[in-house]
């Protein structure tokens, strides 16, 4: 059997024709569109919401300049190839990099079972640094539908990696290389504006994470806790390297009227402007590749809000993408997953428990 690593991400439409399929997959998922409704109501409602949002979302995708779609799939493919090469360099063996998406294409539901069974020769890497029911648990459940067993406690399944030292150091170095204009622009999208940051040591740094509904936190989801821990660890590493600016944590991409994790990044920028802050950099802490939420939301929409609130200097720090130190970190984290048996239900441990589960029952099978 050949060595393989499968990168799993949420997904994004590659062109306009895939937008509706992407949104339907997203809103039909009971762990994403998590409403206290009977399934016979929730699922059709999710499909209706997806169809209604599709035309508006299409305009936003069009504005990014990638043919009416998202670059996420192509960026994930680049990451898979780069990580496979890094694995070959570390192990001296041949590795094949593959990708699949939980929403849209390439569709994880259509993938051959052999690719979805985690083993020492078949690593499954969900590209989520932090646990959430709406991402990691959703992914594991989709894998289980094909494999007929929960994958998360098996060798070859990569758990959320926000606390990994090699990951943390790679993100610290990415931020510092951005500040000091040392990034290879060819490795990043929309990089024409990358010119370094004067007096970077004292700029205000916002770690902006994708928000989730508070109802998930109330069910025990530890996503917010892991985001906060991630920020604290990065702050420590940055301060050790001479950074002295204030660090802030906020949440973006809220959808719908329900209460989401706070503070919202919009509110954060408004408050910083009100407090007289003039220089801000924003890092997308919950994302590992650039797409709609980083290029358009952080890069354009939030920038306008910052300027409108008196902030004179605004920088979008890119997601890691194929940044070499990040790629090496992911390869090492992947190998760590096959070197020790976890034999524990991380979904339940990290907030995937459901009230109706019996003791010892896996939440994947709820």
Swiss-Prot record:
Record-level Gene Ontology MF annotations: ferrochelatase activity; metal ion binding
Reactions mediated catalytically: heme b + 2 H(+) = protoporphyrin IX + Fe(2+)
KW Transferase (keyword) present: no
Pathway connected to this protein: Porphyrin-containing compound metabolism; protoheme biosynthesis; protoheme from protoporphyrin-IX: step 1/1
Localization annotation: Cytoplasm
Keywords noted in UniProt: Cytoplasm, Heme biosynthesis, Iron, Lyase, Metal-binding, Porphyrin biosynthesis
GO biological-process terms attached to the record: heme biosynthetic process
The enzyme's E.C. designation: 4.98.1.1
GO cellular component entries: cytoplasm
Binding site for Fe cation: 210, 293
Enzyme class (EC, first level): lyase
InterPro entries: Ferrochelatase (IPR001015), Ferrochelatase_AS (IPR019772), Ferrochelatase_C (IPR033644), Ferrochelatase_N (IPR033659)
Major localization class: cytoplasm
Role of this protein: Catalyzes the ferrous insertion into protoporphyrin IX.
Family membership: Belongs to the ferrochelatase family.
Protein name: Ferrochelatase
Native organism: Leptospira borgpetersenii serovar Hardjo-bovis (strain JB197)
Primary gene name: hemH
């Amino acid at each position: 059997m050949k060595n393989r690593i499968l990168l799993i991400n949420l997904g994004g439409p590659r062109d306009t024709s895939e937008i509706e399929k992407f949104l339907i997959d997203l809103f039909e998922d009971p762990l994403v569109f998590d409403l206290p409704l009977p399934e016979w109501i929730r699922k059709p409602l999710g499909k209706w919401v997806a169809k209604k949002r599709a035309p508006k979302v299409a305009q936003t995708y069009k504005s990014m300049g990638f043919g009416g779609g998202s670059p996420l799939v192509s960026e994930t493919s680049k990451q898979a190839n780069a990580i496979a090469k890094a694995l070959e360099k570390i192990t001296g063996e041949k590795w094949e990099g593959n990708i699949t998406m939980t929403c849209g294409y390439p569709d994880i539901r259509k993938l051959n079972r052999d690719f979805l069974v985690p083993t020492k020769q078949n690593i499954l890497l969900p590209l989520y640094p932090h646990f959430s029911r709406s991402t990691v648990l959703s992914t594991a459940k989709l894998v289980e539908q094909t494999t007929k067993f929960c994958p998360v406690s098996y060798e070859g399944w990569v758990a959320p990696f926000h606390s990994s030292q090699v990951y943390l150091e790679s993100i610290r170095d990415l931020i510092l290389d951005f500040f000091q204009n040392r990034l290879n622009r060819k490795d990043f999208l929309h990089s024409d504006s990358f010119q370094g940051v004067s007096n970077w040591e004292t700029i205000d740094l916002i770690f902006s994470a994708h928000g989730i509904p508070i109802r998930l936190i109330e069910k025990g989801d530890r996503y917010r806790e892991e985001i906060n821990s991630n920020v604290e660890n990065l702050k420590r590493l940055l301060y050790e390297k001479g950074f002295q600016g204030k660090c802030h944590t906020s949440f973006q991409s809220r959808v719908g009227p329900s209460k989401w994790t706070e503070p919202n990044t919009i509110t954060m920028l408004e408050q910083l402007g009100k407090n007289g802050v003039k220089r801000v950099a924003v890092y997308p802490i919950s994302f590992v590749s650039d797409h709609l939420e980083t290029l358009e939301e952080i890069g354009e929409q939030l920038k306008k809000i910052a300027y409108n609130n008196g902030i004179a200097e605004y920088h979008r720090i890119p997601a890691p993408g194929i940044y070499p130190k990040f790629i090496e970190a992911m390869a090492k984290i992947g190998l760590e997953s096959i070197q020790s048996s976890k034999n524990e239900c991380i979904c339940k441990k990290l907030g995937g428990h459901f009230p109706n589960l019996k003791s010892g029952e896996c939440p994947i099978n709820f």
